[in-house]
Amino acid sequence: MPRVKRGVTARARHKKIINLAKGYRGRRNNVYRIAKQAVMRAGQYAYRDRRNKKRVFRALWITRINAAVRQHDMTYSVFINGLKKASIELDRKVLADMAVFDKAAFAAIVKQVKAAVAA
């Protein structure tokens, strides 16, 4: 059985890690052992923050909706309750976009919600 030398595979593995560490500062971008740790940690942060991003954006949408609804003398929780009563099925992302970019349409929705809450 022939002897297996691992020079080619080791070089490929090292090259992959070094390429992933491009743009890092100091020895993190050209020393394999340090770059490997940096890339592993970057992957952990990326994994965690892909999940965290969803929470952050939802909070942003809620904040924007709340600010826009308060201009119409209503609170966020009353507004969301009114949306359910008026059976308006718009998600928070769309509502936040409307509150920022299409104030007239958002005002019309608030008017419908106020009618549903009053009824």
Curated annotation (Swiss-Prot):
Signal sequence interval, chain numbering: none
Gene3D superfamilies, alphabetized: 6.10.160.10, Ribosomal protein L20
UniProt cross-references to HAMAP family, sorted A to Z: Ribosomal_bL20
GO biological process: ribosomal large subunit assembly; translation
The UniProt record lists the keyword RNA-binding: yes
GO molecular function, one term: rRNA binding
Transmembrane segments: none
Keywords, alphabetical: Ribonucleoprotein, Ribosomal protein, RNA-binding, rRNA-binding
Similarity comment: Belongs to the bacterial ribosomal protein bL20 family.
Xref: PANTHER family: 39S RIBOSOMAL PROTEIN L20
Function of the protein: Binds directly to 23S ribosomal RNA and is necessary for the in vitro assembly process of the 50S ribosomal subunit. It is not involved in the protein synthesizing functions of that subunit.
PROSITE patterns reported for this sequence: RIBOSOMAL_L20
Any Pfam family hit: Ribosomal_L20
Protein name: Large ribosomal subunit protein bL20
GO cellular component: ribonucleoprotein complex; ribosome
